[in-house]
């Protein structure tokens, strides 16, 4: 891993103002090293997704600062955020959001056509663990786990520096979920991609470099694993 943090998060707050004021983040301080595999744990509403959305440029902080390498992205405008997302960040969510009328290969090609130095779509699908004979299948012809692997391939095809994953195994059974985690681990290992995974499954923390525990909008504690478990050894 690089010595320099890829993210530096300083006293970040997030307040949603409506009929009820919600303090989603209450002064988060955190440094994330390039090439780390992080798992974020905590109950619903503890701030995990809010922080990841801010890191990914999908939301903005109410206060504090977020640095990506040496750039303060805290108050980027929409055009700057769009460029930042396009050039540096890949996203994997619980729901796959594939285009139903396109094959697996074509879904990935949608990204590679606008990226600067993309992977070949077939290579991205192979790395994500989708069998070659399934590349020309449509989403409706694929299992949930296969669709998630297409979504992962789509996210990594542009070679992002950061891969942000919000409950990527949340809708999957244990066997399929482990295969998805193996794909994320391979991307982290082979490309040095910084990977953040939000999950409610405490056991997944064993495969991380560090586990960040959230509670009430704050980082409650941080665990460091001296050795990382293989996804296949995780008790679901």
Residue ranges, per PLM feature:
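Conserved beta-strand-loop-alpha-helix hinge in the C-terminal portion
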Residues: 218-236
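ABC family nucleotide-binding domain
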Residues: 5-208, 213-214
């Amino acid at each position: 891993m690089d010595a320099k943090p890829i993210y530096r998060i300083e006293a970040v707050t997030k307040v949603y103002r409506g009929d009820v004021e919600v303090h989603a983040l209450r002064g988060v301080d955190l440094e994330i090293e390039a090439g780390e595999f992080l798992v974020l744990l905590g109950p619903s509403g503890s701030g995990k997704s809010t922080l990841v959305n801010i890191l990914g440029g999908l939301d903005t902080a109410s206060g504090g600062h977020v640095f990506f390498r040496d750039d303060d992205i805290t108050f980027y405008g929409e055009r700057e955020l769009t460029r930042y997302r396009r050039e540096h960040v890949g996203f994997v969510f619980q729901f796959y959001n594939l285009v139903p009328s396109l094959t697996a290969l074509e879904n990935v090609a949608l990204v590679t056509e606008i990226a600067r130095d993309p992977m070949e779509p077939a290579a991205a699908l192979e790395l994500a663990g989708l069998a070659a004979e399934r590349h020309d299948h449509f989403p409706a012809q694929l299992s949930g786990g296969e669709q998630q692997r297409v979504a992962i391939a789509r996210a990594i095809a542009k070679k992002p520096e950061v891969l942000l994953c919000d409950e990527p195994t949340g809708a999957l059974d244990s066997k399929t979920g482990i295969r998805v985690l193996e794909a994320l681990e391979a991307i982290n290992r082979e490309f040095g991609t910084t990977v953040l995974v939000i999950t409610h499954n405490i056991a997944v923390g064993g495969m991380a470099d560090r586990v960040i525990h959230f509670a009430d909008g704050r980082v409650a504690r941080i665990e460091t694993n001296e050795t990382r478990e293989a996804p296949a050894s995780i008790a679901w």
